[in-house]
Regions:
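Acidic, glycine-rich A-domain
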Residues: 1-268
Length: 269
């Protein structure tokens, strides 16, 4: 029997998922410091890595804005479908959502260092309240918290990385929960839409179930556990992936976070 020995650490890969939301403003600097340390560690040990920032603002990167619309406008994003086709009862993913690949082990060292500098200067522009001495990308503002959408997308990112390696670890860096998830509904079934687009959404609550179309397994959902159930669903399909989520909070924020979590645990959703 032939045995192939793979050097420890050479068959692992890391995917970092960074929260690019407005509430990260006060802690983005320290978060980037830790992220850069992890990236340098991966480079030193030759571990493949990808870093993505999740946002609902950078949809503007791949489209030109109308002259009569400000670049901050979210108009017409509902038509920017990020899935093959709109389906009723699917989890809704807004057209403005994007996963931006900001760092990659595939890039040259010189390019990675340049991009780190760009990210650091972008952080400085937020830290100093958009001071003109630190310009920032006009189409890459801090935004909302589409964490659930990001988790859904990690499945495809993991599958892509697993083509060359055996185990993938997903590291999530965020300061809080995702914004309230929703699912697609056909509004024409409930009332006359008067010629308007019949595609609508409803908030996910305790009456909803998440169904894995591949395995048929279902997962009970509430307002507060959607992120955990999405991760569980991915791990059931891809057992060689692990998730590590860090809740990043600023000094003195532990009490607020604990109170918020307790409120969701006792609220009858």
């Amino acid at each position: 029997k032939k045995v192939t020995t793979i050097p420890d650490g050479k068959n692992h890969g890391l995917i970092f998922v960074l929260d690019w939301s407005g509430s990260m403003n006060n802690i983005l600097e320290d978060t980037l410091k830790q992220l850069f340390q992890l990236v340098w560690f991966c480079k030193k040990t030759q571990i493949p890595y990808e870093v993505y920032a999740f946002t609902n603002d950078s949809w503007q990167l791949n489209k030109e804005c109308d002259e009569d619309q400000p670049y901050t406008s979210y108009r017409n994003t509902s038509s920017d479908l990020l899935v093959d086709a709109w389906k009723e009862n699917d989890i809704n993913i807004d057209g403005c959502f994007r996963m931006v690949n900001i760092l990659s082990s595939k890039a040259r060292t010189k390019d990675v260092e340049k991009q780190m500098l760009n990210l650091w200067l972008t952080n400085c522009s937020f830290k100093y309240h958009y001071n003109h001495h630190f310009p920032h990308p006009a189409k890459f503002h801090l935004s909302g918290t589409p964490l659930n959408e990001a988790i859904i997308c990690t499945k495809q990112l993991v599958k892509q990385m697993m083509k060359k390696i055996q185990k993938v670890h997903v590291i999530i860096l965020t300061d809080g929960e995702a914004h309230q998830p929703s699912y697609n509904v056909d509004r024409s079934k409930f009332y006359d839409s008067f010629g308007l687009d019949h595609k609508g959404t409803r908030s996910i609550n305790s009456t909803c179930m998440l169904r894995n179309r591949k395995s048929g397994k279902t997962y009970g959902l509430t307002y507060s556990n959607c992120s955990l159930k999405l991760i569980e669903c991915i791990k059931d399909d891809l057992p060689d992936v692990s998730f590590i989520a860090f809740r990043v909070i600023e000094r003195g924020g532990m009490t607020v976070s604990y109170t918020h979590l307790r409120a969701h645990e006792t609220q009858p959703y």
